[in-house]
Structure formats: C-alpha cells, structure tokens
Amino acid sequence: MVLDGFAAHFDAYLENIVREGKSEHTVAAYRRDLEELFALLAQMPSEDVGGVPQDLSRRDFTAALRRLSQRGLNARTLARKLSSWRQYCVWLVERGLLHTDPTADIKPPKQPERVPKALPQEWLNRMLDLPVDGGDPLAVRDHALFELMYGSGLRVSEIHGLNADDVYLDEAWVHVTGKGRKQRQVPLTGKSVEALKNYLPLRQTASDGKALFTGRNGTRLSQRQIQKRLAQWAAQNGDGRHVSPHMMRHSYAGHLLQASRDIRAVQELLGHSSLSTTQIYTKLDFDHIARLYDEAHPRAKRRDE
C-alpha cells in the first residue's frame, strides 16, 4: 500500500499553518495527529485503504477512528483528531490535490456533557488572602500569577503568552491573545493590580525582557511550570485538593455568572466564540441556584423544613 500521495504535502501544510499564525502548540498537535493517521492507514490491510489520495474514502477514516477508540481514547480526543484530519483534507481539496474531502460527512464521536469543576469561592478567597513573603521574589510572582488566573479567568496558554506590556495597571485591564490568536481586553481586579505592582519590580528578565511571568533565569515560564507552581501552592497551603489552571478558570466563570447572570458578558470575558461553550457554566452550582430560589420565591418550599 502506498500512502505517499496523501502524505506528500504534509510538510507544506504545516508550513502553511505556521504562516497563518498558529501557535507552536497547535502546530505540534496537528503534526502528531496527522503522523498518527498516516501510521494507522499504513497498518491497515491493503483492501481497506486506497493507495492514493483520490482513492481514500470515508471508510478509511472511520476505520482509523475505530482503532483509536479501541485503544481507549475518549470522545473528546477522537473529535480533536478528526478535526485535525479534516483540516488537512480540506486544505488538499482547496489546492486541487484531493478530489473530495472523505471526512466531510463523518460526525465526531458524541461527547458526554461534563459540568466543569469549580472551587468554592470561600476557599479561594482564603487561599489568595494568605500572607505572602515579600522577601521571596518567587512567592510574590506566584501570588500575582494566581490572582490573575482567578481574577481574570485566563487560560494557562494565555497566561504563558503574556508580555509585561500587555498589562495596563492604571486602567486595570490586560490585553490577551487567545485561541486562534483572537485579541480581547479583560479587566483586572483590584487584588490583581496590587499583586502585579508588587511583582513587577522583582521580575527577572532575559535578553528580550518581554515575558510577564519569568523564572529565576529570566525566561518565560512554560505552561507546565505554571501548572506545577499552582499545584504545589494548593498542596502546601490548602486541604489537599487538586487544583489546576482550568479549575481556576472554571471558578472565575461560575462565580461571575452566579453574581451577574449576564452570560453574554461572561462569554466575552472568557474569549468563547460560541455561546454554547459558555452555557455549560450555568450548570455549575445548582445547589446555589436552588437556595436562591428557596429564599426568593414566595411559593417555594424551604428545603430545611
């Protein structure tokens, strides 16, 4: 079986998405997904796969998905891989290198709706109000990092990409580059402004001096380092619960939505392109909503009666 016809333009495709401004993380994910697809197609019996792009069919791609599913990959991961494959096929079709897109009518595996985990507001306030050792630059940095994470609801990739000149302390907002390199402005809380003012004079800088959050050597903190610092902080000062940047973002969204009830505003602040993505946060804390109902509705039955 020959897959050269389908894989021949792989490098050109990756070069193209780099020119389009896709992040290194995104390009690396596309590379992995497509290399995995080529390997899966190469392992299939010759009667299951065509030899050139024009012969590839819907069946070939559904068979590849089925094999990945048998390996235990969840629906979310399978849907992402299918999306990567589809984008490559569309790119080939647009350039006349593939007759039709064989993935066009393949529906991604249905993903179970998962309500994001949010941290209790009281717990977060207590943790963020813990004393900070002003003589320890890393402790001051971490406090600013965590205040920003919860106070503005940024993704870990967005925090990683922040430069010092993205922060406007006098105006109390931060310029964020999100998914798809979309730009947005997000307000800063008073606590975040205070923490950043304490941190910036202590910030270590490398030669370019751009990164907002840096390590001892002055280089930009990686996403993994940010995740690790947050987990360590929670483990050392909290009650043993696991905490991730994603949970901090979920907490920001859920708490803000509970207080404001303005889902459109929360959508803008989070940088969601679709309202349906934001709507999942309406299910974050049904108990809280039920208590409000009990307290406010004249015909509600008190749950403690």
From Swiss-Prot:
Gene3D superfamilies: 1.10.150.130, Intergrase catalytic core. It holds the Pfam family Phage_int_SAM_1. The active site is at R155, K179, H246, R249, H272, Y281. InterPro entries: CB, DNA_brk_join_enz, Integrase-like_cat_sf, Integrase_catalytic, Integrase_recombinase_N, Integrase_SAM-like_N, Recomb_XerC, Tyrosine_recombinase_XerC/XerD. CDD domains: INT_XerDC_C. GO terms for molecular function: DNA binding; tyrosine-based site-specific recombinase activity. Coiled coil: none annotated. Residues 114-294 form the Tyr recombinase domain. GO terms for biological process: cell division; chromosome segregation; DNA transposition. It is found in: Cytoplasm. Belongs to the 'phage' integrase family. XerC subfamily. PANTHER family: PHAGE INTEGRASE-RELATED, TYROSINE RECOMBINASE XERC. Site-specific tyrosine recombinase, which acts by catalyzing the cutting and rejoining of the recombining DNA molecules. The XerC-XerD complex is essential to convert dimers of the bacterial chromosome into monomers to permit their segregation at cell division. It also contributes to the segregational stability of plasmids. Forms a cyclic heterotetrameric complex composed of two molecules of XerC and two molecules of XerD. This is Tyrosine recombinase XerC. It comes from Neisseria meningitidis serogroup C / serotype 2a (strain ATCC 700532 / DSM 15464 / FAM18). The lineage of its organism: Bacteria, Pseudomonadati, Pseudomonadota, Betaproteobacteria, Neisseriales.
